[in-house]
Amino acid sequence: MAAAFSSTVGAPASTPTNFLGKKLKKQVTSAVNYHGKSSKANRFTVMAAENIDEKRNTDKWKGLAYDISDDQQDITRGKGIVDSLFQAPTGHGTHEAVLSSYEYVSQGLRKYDFDNTMGGFYIAPAFMDKLVVHLSKNFMTLPNIKIPLILGIWGGKGQGKSFQCELVFAKMGINPIMMSAGELESGNAGEPAKLIRQRYREAADMIKKGKMCCLFINDLDAGAGRMGGTTQYTVNNQMVNATLMNIADAPTNVQLPGMYNKRENPRVPIVVTGNDFSTLYAPLIRDGRMEKFYWAPTRDDRIGVCKGIFQTDNVSDESVVKIVDTFPGQSIDFFGALRARVYDDEVRKWVGSTGIENIGKRLVNSRDGPVTFEQPKMTVEKLLEYGHMLVQEQDNVKRVQLADTYMSQAALGDANQDAMKTGSFYGKGAQQGTLPVPEGCTDQNAKNYDPTARSDDGSCLYTF
């Protein structure tokens, strides 16, 4: 506390402000006489200057009288404090508050590698290039250029189209608004078209908040295409095609049914996947509206993806290459199913130790928590064995077309015809029981075929 005193007679008190300092606040207080009467002009005057400390202005109760909150930051502060019932999941939907020019500290300091991997998973360079260029181009203002709003990625089944898209989205920091083919049909006419507009405007709302976003529709041809003459073409199919065409033509003027607002919305790129875009309405897939990309992974792409699938299983790169080359005609999801099949032995052991009658109590609402396994050892021999088993199941589906047989004739008494032809009807299952079963060679193509045998004992001899 610094103070300055001066006494004057017949003139008002004055003290140079330079003497008091720049941070000093001048306070003039008139002296009051001892009798409680006001002072006159010639009375003694006291002038005091108080040093203002900036720290004293931080009042923790200031928010009671003045609004000092920041809703954007409060959402982050409330995580873990506010009941989760009232908290949206982080990074999903329009509930994630985003600052206008940068993201929160937890996301704003994130650095991306400009390589074609994400989280240890491989992204095909051609796929990444097409998707990144399309998304970036739709957020740019290019002079006198009409940019297609929709990117259609199509190709064979199980080739990782959706998964590769998700990896690119994660690498770019995009949380897409998702839709599937099942949402493109409804019992109420016009509902799917309205839903597309709602999802599009939701993505536009996220872009307006400063968060890059897009609309991602899975398997568009399954919901809006015509799969042969037996597929009924409904009003909703027509409206879905017409809505996507309208959005592609006017991406900044997307209105909801029953209302019209001239205020423009941000442009939202649309990414769709499918297996055959020739089933779609031709004007929708024309070049000005949809940019098409046929995805057929090369051998290097398949090897790169499979290395990501087996990265936690200590499978060497040479083994992955051997597995991929052994099954050249299989889709990429075949190798994911192959890895999952290896865990069958562990599950079988767990069932034997737990007991079939106790499985429900152990797996559903158990106090012991989820079941955990030791990671099984994966060898090339075991993976190839399970791979051939999967291929055999595929061949069975293609060979045994029972629907054609049942539709063409009354196939009664022929339920096991295919199994008898292939020699797998008797098999080795009968040996697991306690009843005496005659064993022998049950393969009709073997030299020592025994027609009386009802269980194969592995003694078949062949002439090559």
From Swiss-Prot:
Transmembrane segments: none annotated. GO terms for molecular function: ATP binding; ATP hydrolysis activity; ribulose-1,5-bisphosphate carboxylase/oxygenase activator activity. Changing H92D: In strain: cv. Glen. ATP binds at G155, G156, K157, G158, Q159, G160, K161, S162. Keywords: ATP-binding, Chloroplast, Nucleotide-binding, Plastid, Transit peptide. Its main location: plastid. PANTHER family: PTHR32429, RIBULOSE BISPHOSPHATE CARBOXYLASE_OXYGENASE ACTIVASE, CHLOROPLASTIC. Belongs to the RuBisCO activase family. This is Ribulose bisphosphate carboxylase/oxygenase activase A, chloroplastic. The gene is RCAA.
